[in-house]
Each structure stands twice: as structure tokens, then as C-alpha cells.
Design a protein with these regions (language model features):
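Short, well-ordered junction/capping motifs at the entry into regular secondary structure
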Residues: 1-2
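Cofactor-binding beta-sheet edge motifs in enzyme active sites
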Residues: 5-397
Length: 397
């Protein structure tokens, strides 16, 4: 399978206001900005200006989307430099073109999975090899001389999600780093979503070739210590049954499940319609069940799951960064489409609360299972296995 490069495509563009105050003021430097990490922003500003951190104040603003891209000292750096030079408050705002050219984008990746079973259909061998680029140990976080050393150590972001939830006695996962000619960075779910797209597509195809129900087959092959993942998949299967799938041509339902960071469990179903006359793929309905431990705020958890389903549609069908020989071709939402309201499926969510288990982060968990669920639904609807993201109609003709 293959996942093309993606941009964070925040709806709000990056902007910052900086102001130096007179000596004796409580705060010598004030910065207004939308950032995912105001504490890191304060450290960066202190290192840059030589000021004590206590002399700097960050006023966090609404970001309009972050997804890993609002952790860098970029527009803030420009604003601080300019206000220091002219002695007046300065606002710096990127254009949409700047967003695509200067932001750190998710690298493309390519995956190959080979599976063997015994005579009963039980997994016996699992091999997963893939190539991509570092997203944490990258140019924006490390000096150039340290990058080769970091590549020897490995990058938690790019290996995230590469190990399967399925029990094969013989397993091997291989990764090769690629040095991309552009700046890379984290993107919602890091490399877990591309890896799970490969894993869940392979397991779904194996179940079909064996004549097994994909949900039952996945449950039967799960590692024994994963009852929470099994519960998510069973819950989402039951949720999907409440909405009968049309039996006419072009409709399909797919399932996928996965583990994020070893402690978050999720399963997703997707109902898809493929209209060959209009050459159109439509995701009509999705169900998502998620277990991240104690549900501190169930309503907010559901909102995160719904937003992950929106991004799943974009990742599966729309988002691809166009890169030319010497620059990035994508410049706005006309040539880098994201999901719009008319393309958003209806979504049912289920929060599986575990009061005795400490809560874990839920901002990007469901995204790992959404795209493979959509791809598996397309396989049911058309008989064609889509092997790259995003999936275009030409890929399934």
C-alpha cells in the first residue's frame, strides 16, 4: 500500500503579534499566537532573545486547527524580530500559499505486508516492511549534524502503529528511512494511520480469500491480551447492524480496528456508495467505538471521534500534497481539497468507559481505523482492492 504526502491544512492560517515593553514592565515581551505548546513557545522566545522566561508572556489564541503543526517557533520568530527592529507592535500572518510551502508536511510512505497461515487459517507468519521519513527526529527539531545519528536510533513517530494486533508466531517488521528534500513534521496520528491502512487492508483481504467474515476472523486472530480491542470491534459491528446497508449495486460496508500508542483502542465501520455513472465515491455513514480508559468528558470524546471520521474521509479520498520538481504545487483548497459539509457522512459514536483505567489522549486515535474501513467498504462495493491513499475513482475502475 502507499500513502501520499499530506499537509496539515489548518483552516486558520498561522499568525502572531509581538510587542516589547519598556524596562521595568512586568513582561518585557508579549506574544499573542495560536500554539499547541505555549510553554515551548516561551522557551524558544527566551533562547532567541536572551530574556529570562519570566520576562516573557504568551497569550494563547484559538488555532483553528493544529494537528501537530502548531508547535514551531515560526511566525512568532518573525514577529519578535520585527518588533525588536522597529520598536512597535508587529503582526505577522502567513498566506495560504505560505501554509503549504513552509509548513512541515507528513511524508509519503509505502508498505508491503506478507502473511502466511496454517491449514486451519490461523496466522503463522507476518512480515511488514515499509519506507518513509522521520517526523519527530526531523530538520525542524534537530541540528543537521545530529540527523544521521537520530536515524540510527529510530523515530517513534514513524514506527508508531507498525506492529499488528494479530498473533502470528513469527513476526518481523522492517523500516527504511528516506531523506526527503523538504521539511517534514507530525500530522494527526503520525505514521500510525498509514501503517494501519496496510495492516487492516491485508487482514481484510486475507479473510475474503479464506471465505471468512472479516470481523469474526480478525477477532479470532487477535493477540490474547487485547480484550478491549475485541470489545470495540464487537460494539461497532453491532452499531452498524442497526442501519441496514442497501443491497443494490455499488454499496459496501467495511470494518477496521487498531491500537494507538499501546493504550487506546478503536474500531470503525464505513458504509460506502460507488456510483460508476457519476464516477463518484461517497461515504454515507460511519460508526466508531473507542476505549481510551476513563472517559473524563464523554461528549468531548465523541466530538473528537466525529472529527476523526471527517479527517478519515479526507485522508481516504481527498488529501494529497502535489509536489513538483522544485516546489510544492498545492497552494490552496482548490488544489488541496479537504472534506466539506456536503461530503461529511453521518456518524454514530460509542465511548467505552473504563473508570478503573487512567485516561489516555483521544485527539487522533480514531483516525487510524477510519481510512482502512473506507477502503474495505470500497472492496465490498466494487470487488477492487485500493492500495493507495487517497483513493480516486480511477484506482477502482
Amino acid at each position: 500500500t502507499r500513502k501520499e504526502s499530506s499537509a496539515a491544512s489548518d483552516v486558520y492560517k498561522r499568525q502572531a503579534i509581538a510587542r516589547f515593553n519598556d524596562e521595568g514592565s512586568e513582561h518585557l515581551l508579549e506574544i499573542w499566537t495560536g500554539t499547541q505548546d505555549p510553554w515551548a513557545m516561551k522557551r524558544f522566545a527566551a533562547m532567541h532573545t536572551g530574556l529570562d522566561e519570566k520576562a516573557i508572556v504568551i497569550y494563547p489564541q484559538r488555532m483553528g486547527g493544529g494537528f501537530g503543526g502548531r508547535e514551531h517557533y515560526e511566525v512568532e520568530y518573525d514577529a519578535v524580530c520585527l518588533t525588536a527592529a522597529i520598536g512597535r507592535p508587529v503582526k505577522v500572518q502567513w498566506t495560504r500559499r505560505d501554509e503549504f510551502m513552509a509548513a512541515r508536511n507528513r511524508p509519503a510512505s509505502a508498505h508491503r505486508i506478507r502473511i502466511a497461515t496454517d491449514d486451519t487459517g490461523k496466522l503463522s507468519d507476518w512480515w511488514h516492511a515499509y519506507i518513509s521519513g522521520h517526523v519527530i527526529f526531523a530538520r525542524d527539531r534537530l541540528p543537521g549534524w545530529l540527523l544521521p545519528v537520530a536515524r540510527l536510533a529510530g523515530d517513534d513517530g514513524v514506527v508508531r502503529g507498525a506492529n499488528p494486533a494479530y498473533a502470528a508466531p513469527h513476526q518481523r517488521v522492517e523500516y527504511k528511512d528516506v531523506d526527503f528534500p523538504v521539511d517534514l513534521g507530525v500530522w494527526r496520528s503520525l505514521n500510525a494511520a498509514p501503517s494501519l491502512f496496510a495492516i487492516e487492508s491485508a487482514m481484510d483481504e486475507l479473510a475474503l480469500q479464506l471465505g471468512e467474515d472479516p470481523v469474526e476472523y480478525k477477532i479470532s486472530q487477535m493477540k490474547g491480551e487485547l480484550p478491549r480491542l475485541k470489545a470495540c470491534l464487537e460494539r461497532v459491528r453491532d452499531m452498524a447492524k442497526r442501519r441496514p446497508l442497501p443491497q443494490s449495486e455499488g454499496y459496501g460496508r467495511g470494518f477496521a480496528c487498531g491500537i494507538y500508542e499501546g493504550r487506546c483502542f478503536v474500531a470503525v465501520s464505513a458504509d460506502v456508495h460507488v456510483d460508476r455513472e457519476k464516477e463518484q465515491i461517497t461515504v454515507e455513514h460511519m460508526c466508531c467505538a473507542q476505549d481510551v480508559g476513563m472517559a473524563v468528558n464523554p461528549d468531548q470524546l465523541s466530538a473528537q471521534m466525529e472529527s476523526n471520521m471527517a479527517w478519515s474521509v479526507g485522508m481516504a479520498l481527498l488529501e494529497q500534497l502535489e509536489v513538483g520538481d522544485d516546489d510544492i504545487k498545492s497552494s490552496n483548497f482548490d488544489n488541496y481539497p479537504i472534506v466539506r459539509m456536503a461530503e461529511m457522512p453521518s456518524v454514530d459514536t460509542a465511548v467505552i468507559d473504563q473508570p478503573a483505567i487512567p485516561p489516555a489522549g483521544a485527539g487522533e486515535v480514531a483516525l487510524i481505523a477510519g481510512p482502512p474501513a473506507i477502503a474495505n467498504a470500497i472492496r465490498r462495493a466494487t470487488g477492487v482492492r485500493a492500495l493507495k491513499l487517497p483513493i480516486s475513482f480511477a484506482d477502482i475502475e
